[in-house]
């Protein structure tokens, strides 16, 4: 539903804005403010969305807690919204799992997969739906002449739907479960969505596909702002998928100026880290494939790499050991600014958990999504479109580095680095987008179907531009990133000035 301003986006934006406003007003008592906010966000005597103002406020209360980084609670727990706020009311608070949470009393308990005959059935003579059903679940209603499906016999294969000339048979699925490429969403005893965290990789696709807004993730909006207010030098590392996320007229120069107005010491483009990552992965590929490894998979998408390690542990060593663009950019910033704090601002929910890894925690202090950043801008009434342009724009990354944001871009950047130094080298590439496709790709690779290949996996269909923290329509973002990438001063990752820093950053 990215690119469509729904009621869910409206509520999420209000919550992010109010949390940011609360952080900026340090004179406000946080505990009391947390209790007041559900009434400010959902005013009046009647509900706007669910026809129950008390339920709406309760849901908003849990969303506020998650936006503060606090744990989600059940309806059975009797405690104020601000319960435990002391843990969040400080400048340095890391995310604690689980990151993605189902607010149970907001869940509609949608039915699981079901094949259904609609009123569009014409009761035709052919009835191909009956003929193709392998279980004899489709029969004819002698009164109406229409097809009916015995749900006890139906195995949800969808063959009947595929042969209906009138498209009168539909397959209904729980949206969150359908979006989950890890099959991590099931139903609890009340029919509510339940996340199996042993399977979940925190990609956030369930979050953006739930039509009831019952799934939410935790945030560090409050803590980031408090860190800036404390006087610490806080640097923004902005992922290349930012193009167009804050409006079609918001240029990189305007974004940089706006970030500085918020108090950030400076702004770096994570595409410079992507260039470094491409170079490191190219070197590792040439060194290890096929002599030491049967294939190599890219490492920049955390949901993809975590999925690979969970489902294919025997081939975990085939996931590139190269540092991700986020980590490399943060290291670069801290190398030149030793006492700095770094905020990664991007499209990805899974980056929040990547930042919790022991190997990354000292590099990346906070992670925010573009959607959360939009709330911060609104809290300070920053008019990005009319902001005076910062002539320096953002960092000088390459075309290939900026294209990391789009599916296929990572592998292309690595191949281009190899081809520059070894033009005779043949590089075989396979890529997948969406966790279902990614799982299939890795399954085939482990069976020996991709010997010597470079494999690229993107958990979100379309790449980073389709991440859970984006706001713009995916195709629009892909086009915008492509145009922005072409404006880079360098085509290839190995041509940028930052490449010389790589050896110092990965020692």
Where on the chain are the PLM-derived regions?
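Iron-sulfur-associated redox domains of electron-transfer enzymes in respiratory
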Residues: 1-77, 84-87, 217-507
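N-terminal [4Fe-4S]-dependent radical SAM core
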Residues: 89-118, 135-136
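Short, intrinsically disordered, charge-biased short linear motifs at domain edges
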Residues: 105-111, 117-120, 163-169, 185-189, ...
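Short flexible coil/turn linkers enriched for glycine and charged/polar residues
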Residues: 111-114, 127, 158, 204, ...
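Short, surface-exposed ligand-recognition loops at beta-strand->loop->(often short) alpha-helix junctions
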Residues: 122-124, 248
């Amino acid at each position: 539903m990215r690119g469509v301003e729904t009621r869910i986006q409206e509520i999420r934006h209000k919550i992010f804005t109010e949390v940011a406003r609360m952080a900026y007003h340090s004179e406000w008592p946080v505990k009391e403010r947390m209790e007041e906010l559900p009434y400010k966000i959902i005013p009046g005597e009647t509900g706007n969305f669910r026809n129950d103002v008390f339920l709406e406020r309760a849901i908003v209360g849990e969303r506020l807690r998650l936006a503060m980084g606090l744990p989600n609670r059940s309806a059975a727990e009797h405690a104020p919204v601000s319960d435990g706020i002391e843990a969040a009311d400080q400048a340095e608070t890391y995310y604690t799992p689980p990151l993605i949470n189902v607010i149970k009393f907001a869940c509609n308990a949608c039915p699981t997969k079901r094949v259904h005959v609609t009123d569009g059935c014409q009761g035709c003579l052919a009835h191909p739906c009956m003929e193709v059903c392998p279980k004899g679940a489709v029969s004819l209603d002698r009164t109406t002449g229409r097809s009916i499906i015995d749900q006890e016999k139906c195995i949800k294969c969808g063959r009947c739907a595929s042969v209906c000339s009138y498209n009168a048979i539909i397959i209904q699925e729980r949206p969150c479960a359908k979006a989950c490429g890890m099959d991590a969403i099931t139903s609890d005893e009340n029919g509510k969505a339940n996340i199996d965290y042993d399977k979940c990789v925190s990609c956030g696709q369930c979050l953006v596909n739930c039509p009831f807004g019952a799934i939410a993730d935790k945030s560090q909006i409050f803590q980031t702002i408090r860190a800036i207010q404390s006087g610490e030098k806080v640097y923004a590392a902005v992922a290349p998928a930012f193009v167009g996320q804050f409006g079609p007229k918001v240029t990189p120069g305007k974004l940089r100026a706006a970030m500085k107005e918020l108090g950030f010491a400076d702004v770096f483009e994570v595409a410079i880290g992507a260039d470094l990552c491409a170079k490191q992965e190219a070197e590792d590929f040439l060194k290890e494939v096929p002599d030491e490894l049967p294939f190599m998979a890219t490492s920049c998408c955390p949901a993809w790499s975590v999925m690979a390690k969970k489902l294919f542990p025997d081939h975990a060593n085939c996931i590139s050991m190269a540092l991700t663009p986020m980590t490399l950019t943060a290291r670069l910033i801290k190398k030149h600014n030793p006492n700095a704090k770094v905020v990664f601002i991007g499209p990805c929910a899974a980056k929040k958990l990547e930042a919790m890894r022991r190997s990354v925690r000292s590099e990346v202090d906070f992670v925010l999504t573009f959607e959360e950043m939009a709330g911060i801008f609104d809290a300070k009434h920053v008019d990005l479109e009319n902001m005076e342009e910062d002539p320096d724009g953002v960092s000088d990354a390459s075309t290939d580095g900026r294209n990391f944001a789009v599916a296929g871009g990572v592998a292309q950047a690595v191949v281009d680095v190899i081809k520059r130094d070894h033009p005779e080298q043949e590089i075989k590439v396979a890529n997948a987008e969406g966790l279902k496709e990614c799982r299939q790709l890795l399954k085939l690779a482990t069976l020996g179907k991709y010997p010597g290949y470079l494999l690229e996996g993107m958990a979100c269909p379309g790449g980073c531009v389709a991440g859970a923290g984006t706001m713009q329509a995916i195709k629009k973002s892909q086009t915008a990133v492509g145009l922005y990438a072409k404006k880079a001063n360098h085509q290839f990752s190995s041509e940028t000035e930052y490449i010389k820093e790589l050896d110092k950053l990965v020692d």
